[in-house]
């Protein structure tokens, strides 16, 4: 990968965000997702690369575009693997709530963990706590470590947790330490990455979310130098989700084995989930969020706010782009 490719990857998420944002607040989450998928795939198709989707919209028989294993790009150039979520937080987009974004991770061929469509226990924390907090430890232990690493009182810490029934005990434990809990309804990728930046008011992400999004978060946190660990969850009694109502622990273990994952309890570090020499994260806001604004439609232009983090040059670039419409007569500075 090179810097030219990184610029094109930025444009991929920008176009997906704009497409979804056209439907913000209309209650049409599936349509918003489909629009983002189509826009993302179209822009990817114009890039000089041998791209491959390793995490996408599902298996080939489940998704018409951006399915796992789909080849994208011109068919010549560098080999690049992608983990994509064209509209992360579809409910957030449909309801015009904060935190929806178009997002992807990219790496050299073979550089991203092909996460199954399972759940994942996650722990994200700032660079100062890297290697000190640990997903094996209790929430209380990690909060105390985080307090020490950041030089902050426990009462000043904010821990983000997905608002799910499975997290009832976790939330109670966090609050018992004196730390604050920020429950979120959807979209834990942005919350995880926000832990890597000071000043966001978010100091740690704990709890269980989707495994594919865990890979995208890991790519960003690896490039930032932050802490990220993930552990697959295969027990329906722990996941506590209606999607697994008919699944069994034994059946899920068998599914993992079929995918070549023989140790379902393995704890993955960020550099195992995103192991490539060159790793890039790109996200563009659909709605306003912790890291950037959502898409803004104006008479003569459309504005996007995005973030690209890359190990290639050790940068995190916040980008505000003005997409000028044909016949534009007046473009304001902001």
From Swiss-Prot:
Q: How does it assemble?
A: Homotetramer.
Entry EC no(s): 3.1.3.11, 3.1.3.37
Query: Which Pfam families does this chain map to?
Result: FBPase_glpX
Give an example GO molecular function.
sedoheptulose-bisphosphatase activity
Q: Which Gene3D superfamilies match?
A: 3.40.190.90, Fructose-1,6-Bisphosphatase, subunit A, domain 1
Its annotated function is as follows: Catalyzes the hydrolysis of fructose 1,6-bisphosphate (Fru 1,6-P2) and sedoheptulose 1,7-bisphosphate (Sed 1,7-P2) to fructose 6-phosphate and sedoheptulose 7-phosphate, respectively.
UniProt organism field: Prochlorococcus marinus (strain SARG / CCMP1375 / SS120)
Tell me which residues bind Mn(2+) 1.
33, 57
Question: SUPFAM superfamilies under this entry?
Answer: Carbohydrate phosphatase
Per UniProt, substrate binds at 88-90, 119, 164-166, 186-188
| EC top class named in words | hydrolase
Specify which residues bind Mn(2+) 2 according to the UniProt entry for this protein. Answer: 85, 88, 213
Write the protein's name: D-fructose 1,6-bisphosphatase class 2/sedoheptulose 1,7-bisphosphatase
Q: Which domain of life is it from?
A: Bacteria
Annotated PANTHER family: FRUCTOSE-1,6-BISPHOSPHATASE 1 CLASS 2-RELATED, FRUCTOSE-1,6-BISPHOSPHATASE CLASS 2
Biological process GO terms, please?
A: fructose 1,6-bisphosphate metabolic process; gluconeogenesis; glycerol metabolic process; reductive pentose-phosphate cycle
**Catalytic activity of the protein:** beta-D-fructose 1,6-bisphosphate + H2O = beta-D-fructose 6-phosphate + phosphate; D-sedoheptulose 1,7-bisphosphate + H2O = D-sedoheptulose 7-phosphate + phosphate
In terms of InterPro entries, this protein maps to: FBPase_class-2/SBPase
Report the pathway entry: Carbohydrate biosynthesis; Calvin cycle
User: GO CC annotations?
Assistant: cytosol
Q: Which cofactor does it need?
A: Mn(2+)
Which family does the UniProt entry place this protein in? Answer: Belongs to the FBPase class 2 family.
- Keyword set for this entry? Calvin cycle, Carbohydrate metabolism, Hydrolase, Manganese, Metal-binding
